[in-house]
Amino acid sequence: MAQHDQLHRYLFENYAVRGELVTVSETWKQILENHDYPMPVKTLLGELLVATSLLTATLKFAGDITVQLQGDGPMTLAVINGNNRQQMRGVARVQGDVPADADLKTLVGNGYLVITITPEEGERYQGVVGLEGDTLAACLEDYFMRSEQLPTRLFIRTGEAQGQPAAGGMLLQVLPAQDAQTDDFNHLATLTETIKADELFTLPANDVLWRLYHEEEVTVYDPQAVEFKCTCSRERCADALRTLPDEEVAQILEEDGEVDMHCDYCGTHYVFDAMDIAGIRKNASPADPQVH
């Protein structure tokens, strides 16, 4: 079996092209765990997860990337957020019936792809592109050509391995400020396109790379672990409560006896009673109870 949920970066010695290979099956399972999405939505979230992991690995600084799809289709939102430590989380919102064979256009309808890059230090950048491609990979390749002017190819696979959800993918990209020959890039893309889903899901990364590129000279760097990680906390919820008008919070307490805040990403509930709210209003630290 492959070492799942790892990202491998690699470099071609004879071409100005770099690559990435990632498997994210366990992380995908955890993202889906607290939700009952229709199968096409699950699949698209898996594709988004693979893509976000690959894109996050292109960052040259500490920060995070959010990749989201928005539209007027039955899936109004799908979003994956990841940081340079390959800590990922994601969620989708569905309104209306989703056909069992729904593709990207059917799910999103008239919509667009938004990529937000947020460095820990420096200015936030946001790029928006229409969904002109038939697949998520095609839309992202279009984004790179428009915004970065870097020829980029993504190869995304989702499915099952041993009865469990499995997802992985690969990225090829011309190195910035390098003049890679189009024929060279297309040659490597043609090789990479032959990757089979079951190979990606079940073989060690080095075996996959050897099968694809055994006639090329490739340097493979140490892998980086990929994991599901939610950034929600009781303190963040308390900060959000501080921004609400006193009357609104008082009304919730009067009607429900407590304020129950739910994280869409991980399913955790943070419950605040009247004493907690009073403490928050005085800037005191709320107590610890939370419910998964």
Swiss-Prot record:
Q: Name one GO cellular component term.
A: cytoplasm
- Assign the protein's first listed, main location to one coarse class: cytoplasm
What one GO molecular function would you report for this record? unfolded protein binding
Q: Tell me any Pfam family this protein matches.
A: HSP33
What InterPro entries does the entry give?
Heat_shock_Hsp33 (IPR000397), Heat_shock_Hsp33_C (IPR016154), Heat_shock_Hsp33_N (IPR016153), Hsp33_helix_hairpin_bin_dom_sf (IPR023212)
Signal peptide, first to last residue:
none
Q: Write the record's keywords in alphabetical order, separated by commas.
A: Chaperone, Cytoplasm, Disulfide bond, Redox-active center, Zinc
The lineage's top-level taxon is: Bacteria
What modifications does the entry list under PTM / processing?
Answer: Under oxidizing conditions two disulfide bonds are formed involving the reactive cysteines. Under reducing conditions zinc is bound to the reactive cysteines and the protein is inactive.
Q: Answer whether the UniProt record assigns the keyword Amino-acid biosynthesis to this protein.
A: no
Where does it live in the cell? Answer: Cytoplasm
Disulfide bond residue pairs:
230-232, 263-266
GO biological process terms, semicolon-separated: protein refolding
Show the NCBIfam families listed in the entry: PRK00114.1 (NF001033)
Q: Which family does it belong to?
A: Belongs to the HSP33 family.
Q: What does this protein do?
A: Redox regulated molecular chaperone. Protects both thermally unfolding and oxidatively damaged proteins from irreversible aggregation. Plays an important role in the bacterial defense system toward oxidative stress.
Q: Which HAMAP family match?
A: HslO
Name-wise, this protein is: 33 kDa chaperonin
